[in-house]
A protein has these predicted regions:
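Short, acidic loop-to-helix structural element flanking the phosphoryl-transfer center
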Residues: 2-36, 40-50
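Short acidic-hydrophobic, aromatic-tinged amphipathic segments that line or gate anion-handling sites
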Residues: 61-66, 115-127
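Substrate-recognition "cap/lid" segment bordering the active-site pocket of phosphatases
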Residues: 40-81, 87-94
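Short amphipathic alpha-helix with an adjacent loop that forms part of the alpha/beta core around
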Residues: 72-76, 120-135
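Acidic, Mg2+-coordinating phosphoryl-transfer loop and its flanking beta/alpha structural elements
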Residues: 82-119
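A structural preference for short, hydrophobic beta-strand core positions in alpha/beta folds
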Residues: 35, 60-63, 102
Length: 135
């Protein structure tokens, strides 16, 4: 079933500009991020446009089209800590030496990891320091 979903995203949604531009904002940082890093399969210009339309700070966008790739390969050395809502992405970054925190969502509720529940700078700093102390 997952491979069918992946094929449909690649074949259909990757070309649907309106789909990508109308995604709802689920989290908003209370700080200016160093960069954005995504594995979206859409045109990178659409991601930049979505960020602009939704009032996000203008920062570099690093986009990886290979879904099994490691985001750390693109951004290691550019950020102090990486936050993602994908367990796989967080684990790959951590194994590569890039500190990473898991964003708490319905999909990640059962994973007992170092998490953040918002993109609040103070919460991220606390979670990062806790992770560095105990990981």
């Amino acid at each position: 079933e997952d491979s069918m979903i992946t094929r449909n995203v690649q074949r259909i949604l990757s070309k649907d500009r309106d789909f990508w531009l109308n995604l709802k904002v689920t989290n908003r940082p209370d700080f200016i991020p160093e960069l954005y890093c995504t594995k979206r399969v859409n045109n990178k210009a659409w991601t930049k446009e979505w960020l602009r339309l939704n009032g996000f700070p203008d920062r570099p966008v690093y986009q990886m089209y290979y879904q099994h790739g490691n985001k750390a390969d693109m951004i290691k050395g550019k950020v102090d800590v990486f936050i993602d809502d994908s367990l796989s992405n967080v684990l790959k970054c951590q194994r590569s030496g890039l500190p990473a925190l898991l964003m708490h969502t319905e999909r990640t509720i059962d994973f007992p990891m170092f998490k953040v529940f918002s993109l609040c700078k103070d919460e991220i700093i606390d979670a990062y320091q806790f992770m560095r102390s105990y990981a």
